[in-house]
Regions:
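Short intrinsically disordered, low-complexity coil segments enriched in acidic
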Residues: 1-12, 16, 149-155, 162-164, ...
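Residue-identity detector for threonine
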Residues: 3, 7-12, 26, 63, ...
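Conserved beta-strand elements of the Class I
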Residues: 26-30, 108, 185
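Phosphate/Mg2+-binding loops and adjacent switch elements
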Residues: 33-156, 163-169
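Walker A (P-loop) phosphate-binding motif
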Residues: 1-45
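Short, flexible coil/turn micro-motifs enriched in small/turn-prone residues
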Residues: 1-3, 48, 90, 176
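P-loop NTP-binding site
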Residues: 178-185
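A short helix/loop element that forms part of the nucleotide-sugar donor recognition site in Leloir-type
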Residues: 169-175
Length: 185
């Protein structure tokens, strides 16, 4: 994405990986591992968030695909492919600004509500780079109901939370319908 903050990249990566699996591909996912310790390593379902970041663990659990983190996406990809030679497609989570990484398809995820904020680059605004970068991408995923007039094909998505997890009792979950009309705090 070209803006800072949550745009829906992680759910998009999960959806793309699972769609590729449904079509017979074997995806692997590489990520920087934001808020991890910066070491290049494989992410497993039982990995520690302080080492690999929380989003790569979620991706690993939701896709059951190999996931590797590290500051260099190229090295992460090399390690992943060495350990998992059956992987035939790589997905880079948050790799749009990682120009050293060759790519065949570029997807940009845009928050349909916030769009591009005030249109200014960091530190004055939310843009990591110019909006002109959009035109270099193959298509955009717009998170939210807002339609954007872009010069590239777009796909709209809306994230809907269906399950709540009790943080005090991790084994306890409930459906959003179970909470309808009840006070929650």
């Amino acid at each position: 994405n070209i803006t800072v903050g949550g745009t829906g990249k992680t759910p998009t990566v999960i959806a793309i990986a699972n769609a590729l699996k449904a079509y017979g591909y074997t995806p692997g996912i590489i990520s920087r591992g934001y808020r991890g310790d910066g070491q290049e390593q494989e992410v497993l379902a039982n990995s520690v968030p302080s080492q690999v970041g929380d989003e790569p663990i979620l991706i690993s659990k939701k896709t059951l695909s190999p996931v590797w983190v590290g500051p260099s996406r190229i090295k992460a990809a090399q390690h992943l492919l060495t350990k998992h030679p059956n992987v035939n497609v790589l997905i880079s989570d948050d790799g749009l600004q990682h120009y050293a990484l060759k790519r065949d398809i570029e997807v940009i995820v845009i928050d349909g509500s916030r769009k591009f904020g005030n249109g200014l680059p960091l530190p004055s605004g939310p843009l990591r780079e110019s909006k002109k970068r959009i035109h270099e991408c193959d298509f955009a995923v717009i998170n939210g109901s807002e339609k954007l007039d872009l010069s590239i094909p777009t796909i709209n998505m809306t994230l809907v939370g269906e399950i709540f997890h009790n943080l005090s009792n991790p084994g306890h979950t409930c459906n959003v319908n179970e909470l309808w009309g009840r006070d929650v705090a």
